[in-house]
């Protein structure tokens, strides 16, 4: 046999062996294996040990430590921020839209993006350790508007969710398939569903998902959690976009069904001051508005001046009307106002019309002695939020007095 041929085979074999060794070494460095320890808040009693692999958000959850993640770990909400002191690797490009360069230098990361490859040292907010999971039972799931349901859940007997008004919970769903044609929707709301043929949609989810929803209930409504959930249907101009996964799941729920939630979470809390409170809402942004206003007037018996400005398309989209009318009758410091952007002829509407930010300005803030001294709490569709914020900035309101809940619209 030719010596050059034999030499070539030998050289090739040697190269393959060297590459195999390099790959094995790299694998030992880069690929998850073995158990690792996550030290938490410099407290040995809080440290957890678990197999390497996955993301930090999931690793913590597997040990009963639930960090807020409105998007369910997709990296889009920026809520799951933790400080990683060591062991987290370099910050990823997907995190930089939520974390500034200064924060990155301080160790802030999105826990849903941090790979658990080696032992690490992290710092978590203390309130995280008060977060729990509950398996709840659906009490009711009724339409309050064309695209909004009120989901009412019973907490297990003897348990309570120690939340503050304006807080939120996370709701979970296992893989499932939901057909819109099976939704229970009263006849009065069928017009738009028929118009856009929404009954044709099917939501198929192949993985476990988590989403956040603001609570409509307030702390003295014991034993229940109440949500206002807007169905995320595909936009009319792009009907082939998949429908919202979690909202479709929630709309399919029926009394007696079991639902897993975790919480409480939140930062959209009322300030403890005597300043006037102006609440501005639209759509499913009603949820935290109801929670806050009921808490102020029914639990705290607040004497602060409070007004609520809510935007809807037509009378069919108005809800909790009797509740707010009663609060207004019982509390001289509270008024509430609705503006319809597209009232129907049969509405016979003689109230405010137009967009809520314009109505609020023209009919109240324009002639207010000191709008910059009020506190503004808002939750609604992104377009509404942006319009209200610009209007308030033009009036000289400082950012610290503009409080926004991004979840409810």
From Swiss-Prot:
Family affiliation:
Belongs to the NqrF family.
Quote the record's cofactor note. Binds 1 [2Fe-2S] cluster.
Assembly and interaction partners: Composed of six subunits; NqrA, NqrB, NqrC, NqrD, NqrE and NqrF.
- Please identify the protein, giving its name as recorded: Na(+)-translocating NADH-quinone reductase subunit F
Q: What is the annotated role of this protein in its UniProt record? A: NQR complex catalyzes the reduction of ubiquinone-1 to ubiquinol by two successive reactions, coupled with the transport of Na(+) ions from the cytoplasm to the periplasm. The first step is catalyzed by NqrF, which accepts electrons from NADH and reduces ubiquinone-1 to ubisemiquinone by a one-electron transfer pathway.
Pfam families of this UniProt entry? FAD_binding_6 (PF00970), Fer2 (PF00111), NAD_binding_1 (PF00175)
Q: Does the keyword Hydrolase apply?
A: no
Q: According to the lineage, what is the superkingdom?
A: Bacteria
For this protein, what is the EC number?
7.2.1.1
Q: List the disulfide bonds.
A: none
User: What GO MF annotations does this protein's record show?
Assistant: 2 iron, 2 sulfur cluster binding; electron transfer activity; metal ion binding; oxidoreductase activity, acting on NAD(P)H, quinone or similar compound as acceptor
Identify the species of origin. Answer: Actinobacillus succinogenes (strain ATCC 55618 / DSM 22257 / CCUG 43843 / 130Z)
NCBIfam families per the UniProt record, alphabetical = nqrF
Q: Tell me which residues bind [2Fe-2S] cluster.
A: 71, 77, 80, 112
Q: What reactions does this protein catalyze? A: a ubiquinone + n Na(+)(in) + NADH + H(+) = a ubiquinol + n Na(+)(out) + NAD(+)
Asked whether the UniProt record includes Membrane among its keywords, one would answer yes
Q: Could you tell me the gene encoding this protein?
A: nqrF
Instruction: Give membrane topology per the record.
Output: Single-pass membrane protein
